Amino acid sequence: MTDVTIKALASEIQTSVDRLIQQFADAGIRKSADDSVTAQEKQTLLTHLNREHGSAPDKLTLQRKTRSTLNIPGTGGKSKSVQIEVRKKRTFVKRDPQEAERLAAEEQAQREAEEQARREAEEAAKREAQLKAEREAAEQAKREVADKAKREAAEKDKVSNQHTDEMTKTAQAEKIRRENEAAELKRKSEEEARRKLEEEARRVAEEARRMAEENEKNWSETSDSPEDSSDYHVTTSQHARQAEDDNDREVEGGRGRSRSSKAARPAKKGNKHAESKADREEARAAVRGGKGGKHRKGSALQQGFQKPAQAVNRDVIIGETITVGELANKMAVKGSQVIKAMMKLGAMATINQVIDQETAQLVAEEMGHKVILRRENELEEAVMSDRDTGAAAEPRAPVVTIMGHVDHGKTSLLDYIRSTKVASGEAGGITQHIGAYHVETDNGMITFLDTPGHAAFTSMRARGAQATDIVVLVVAADDGVMPQTIEAIQHAKAAQVPVVVAVNKIDKPEADPDRVKNELSQYGILPEEWGGESQFVHVSAKAGTGIDDLLDAILLQAEVLELKAVRNGMASGAVIESFLDKGRGPVATVLVREGTLHKGDIVLCGFEYGRVRAMRDELGREVLEAGPSIPVEILGLSGVPAAGDEVTVVRDEKKAREVALYRQGKFREVKLARQQKSKLENMFANMTEGEVHEVNIVLKADVQGSVEAISDSLLKLSTDEVKVKIIGSGVGGITETDATLAAASNAILVGFNVRADASARKVIEAESLDLRYYSVIYNLIDEVKAAMSGMLSPELKQQIIGLAEVRDVFKSPKFGAIAGCMVTEGTIKRHNPIRVLRDNVVIYEGELESLRRFKDDVNEVRNGMECGIGVKNYNDVRVGDMIEVFEIIEIQRSID
């Protein structure tokens, strides 16, 4: 249908253009005279008009008038003509479709009710006829008894009245005749019923024989074994017995007759499923039983299940975690029953929620089942126990961790000890991840771990303290105890590791070693000369003074500790650091604790496993083995392990893979169990939270420790208004997948000591993504803070700009009360918000409506000048009031 204009449509339907435009406007469609109208808009208008004026009338009234003339004879023989008008009125009602359906349903229900009533009436008539026949039979029996008594009386008194005797004999003969007729009718009906039953029995037997012949034919086609005859006889005898039972039930009558007739209904030709399942099973059982001997009997295979009289108590095996649905399946009950039992115990759970072993045990025992607790790490324990750990323990080198505040000279001190220049290679001179080195000294070998001092690397310092024997706490003599120094002391105490204090930068003029001792004593680190257990050594990493004394102190402390380890046997250790190398794959820095790690060993490392393909020391040289307290880089793992994971050499790579996969699944279950679910108790808290802005970040770094540290630091920046969300993180360069993820989630791409490859740069350029590279963690955190600060809503502050004192009050016909004021402070500006103060109490807050000076409207009045002030919608201004003018300024907030 083509579109027409408003004018053409108006002429077509014979109405005015203005009326048609108004009708379209009422229907919600704005049109002008030259606009075109689509078919959809026409339909909308038609629907609106039908709704306004109503569609076709529901009632139709027809009126008919019939006029005729009637001649009425009048007086004097004259006829009088009378006009007669007959008016007929008939109303037709158009029913609503729902009403029509309802009436049709009512008519159908009425017809069904009438049919039901008719059937009930017929049944009542049948019952009445049967009762009437029974009553007649009873009366007949009574009459027979009475007649017998009369006959006996008549025989005793034969001579009394011959005529009476003859009448009695005639009545008796009539009664005998009626009795004979009733007996004949009863005999005929019984013969008819017996004949029908016999025909039915013959038909059932014939059907049974026919089915037996078909079964014999089927069995003969599939097998030529002598069991066919057995099948034939068993099937035939079975159906014969069935026919006999049916016949007996029909003869007995009652409900059994109707049921047996239904059961004996003939099966369709060719329907192999017409036989009952019990018959076929018994026939097959008899055939199988015929192999053993001739006299083996076939027993009917019937369902032997009976509903248990009491609850079945089961042995429920429960692992460390289990979902509510799995627990319900193990107890063979519905999940709702388990949830109900948990609610009785005071715990709310959904059917897919993971519950711990103790809760599952309580629920199962509450429901009456026996619980068997299963340790799911049996395979892991078996793999760990099947290790050759050696026997003889030998002295080993101490593992020393250098800890302290940032920029206190930890790396410089270690540089001097190693006689290499490493700090210049660190970005900004700050250690970004753990470095592990072993140093040969004149008095023996020492392994050093250099940890970062920045606040973000708390977890890395904690790992360093756990993997170490001695902590060297570096404190700058000119700076004293700082926050990370205190944190290092706490880590050392938590790991129960002895502390050797190196007071660094002793060569500076402002150095104050005694101040360091006093401050450290407040945290439980007392020098030996004060009766404590900690050695204090004054060193200068720049000048090299005191370095030998520090090494001697470390070796002395190690000698006191009597450090020993098994050198021969399968190695075990810890991951100090890990990262993903583009050419070599996952690389892990491992500190061997016991045994000897060889090239080619199969290692299990947290969620990862693999064969050691290559080993390198801290200088990048290839080595074939590493003993206790030796840090090495290993290649060949299946993935990047988490820093701090245990490294264990095992015998079987297949079992190592199984254990690693089990650990991954276990970690996932624990993570799901810890997830915060949106339950009823925190629903209102979620509802009350306002709009929260999010800063999405995709983070890539060079090593795993840096990823963890940066993620923790960024997540700690989150506030109630702005939250940091790490969409994705990983080790290695920025790939195309990372760029696509950032584009899909509107995230910032952050690279820490890594770069984007060519394909990623194309996606970043095409999507105009925000890509930022960092090499110092300070800069990264500061820029994310700045981005978050931009998302914070500004803070509104009221700043008073002027104060005026009311000296007099005038009346104005236009503005009402006008306050004649003297500006005492600042500037009074027009259209600014004001407050009216009376006795230093705010009584009104509004805005200036009029500001005049000598009858001239002005925009502002300065200090020391008089003016007239009209306050909008306020006339209760009195002499002595103060009018305070202020302005609202926005202050940009920042993340602290």
From Swiss-Prot:
Its main location: cytoplasm. Residues 256-271 have a biased composition (Basic residues). Residues 429-433 are annotated as: G2. GTP binds at residues 404-411, 450-454, 504-507. Residues 93-219, 272-285 have a biased composition (Basic and acidic residues). Residues 93-307 are annotated as: Disordered. Residues 540-542 are annotated as: G5. Residues 504-507 are annotated as: G4. InterPro entries: DNA-bd_dom_put_sf (IPR009061), EF-G-like_DII (IPR053905), EFTu-like_2 (IPR004161), IF2_assoc_dom_bac (IPR013575), IF2_II (IPR044145), IF2_N (IPR006847), P-loop_NTPase (IPR027417), Small_GTP-bd (IPR005225). One of the essential components for the initiation of protein synthesis. Protects formylmethionyl-tRNA from spontaneous hydrolysis and promotes its binding to the 30S ribosomal subunits. Also involved in the hydrolysis of GTP during the formation of the 70S ribosomal complex. PANTHER family: TR-TYPE G DOMAIN-CONTAINING PROTEIN, TRANSLATION INITIATION FACTOR IF-2-RELATED. This is Translation initiation factor IF-2. It comes from Klebsiella pneumoniae (strain 342).
